[in-house]
């Protein structure tokens, strides 16, 4: 697990980011960080489903299913269980995102992340970097994967693959 001090620090970081984006609402599920494998998948499904029913999103972003991080894997599985179109007709599309420090670190055989959908973030890259810098508990110096240089480099790579100056990729 993660220490209470780090959890409190992350809560403050999330609040700063939420304020910067001017989100109307954020949801704190109060589940054990880095320990979602210790709770029933059903518990996670119910919590995510409750939010989906409340928000009724048309577009869902979820972690890539083969992400090496156990929490990301469990969130992806639970979210997929929640977003079946026959139960949630308001959901039009779901896209899996890549997480620079986790998605491509699965060295086992199996499905790898395939960049299939790109969003142009050229106008927002500076803002993305500013937001990433708020997450001091997650960012470190290069060559750490979650460095500012790595984040910019991935955005430029995805941009070059899609005809933009900078992009984010989804599957």
Task: Give names to the regions the model predicted.
Residues 8, 73, 145-149:
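An alpha-helix initiation/capping motif
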Residues 13, 17-25, 91-92, 96-171:
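The feature marks non-catalytic terminal segments
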Residues 1-55, 85-88, 154, 171:
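Active-site rim/loop-helix segments in enzyme catalytic domains that contact anionic ligands
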Residues 38-40, 72-73, 105-109:
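Short, well-ordered secondary-structure micro-motifs
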Residues 29-32, 63, 97:
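Conserved residues at the C-terminal ends of beta-strands
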């Amino acid at each position: 697990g993660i220490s209470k001090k780090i959890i409190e620090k992350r809560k403050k970081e999330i609040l700063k980011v939420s304020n910067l984006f001017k989100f109307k609402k954020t949801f704190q599920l109060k589940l054990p960080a880095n320990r979602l494998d210790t709770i029933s998948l059903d518990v996670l499904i119910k919590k995510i489903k409750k939010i989906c029913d409340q928000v009724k999103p048309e577009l869902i972003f979820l972690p890539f299913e083969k992400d090496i991080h156990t929490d990301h894997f469990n969130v992806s599985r639970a979210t997929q269980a929640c977003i079946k179109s026959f139960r949630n007709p308001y959901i039009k599309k779901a896209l899996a995102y890549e997480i620079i420090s986790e998605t491509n670190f699965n060295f086992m055989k199996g499905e790898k992340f395939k960049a299939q959908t790109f969003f142009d973030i050229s106008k927002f890259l500076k803002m993305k970097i500013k937001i990433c810098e708020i997450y001091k508990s997650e960012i470190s110096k290069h060559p750490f994967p979650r460095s500012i240089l790595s984040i910019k480099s991935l955005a430029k790579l995805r941009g070059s693959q899609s005809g933009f100056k900078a992009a984010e990729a989804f599957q």
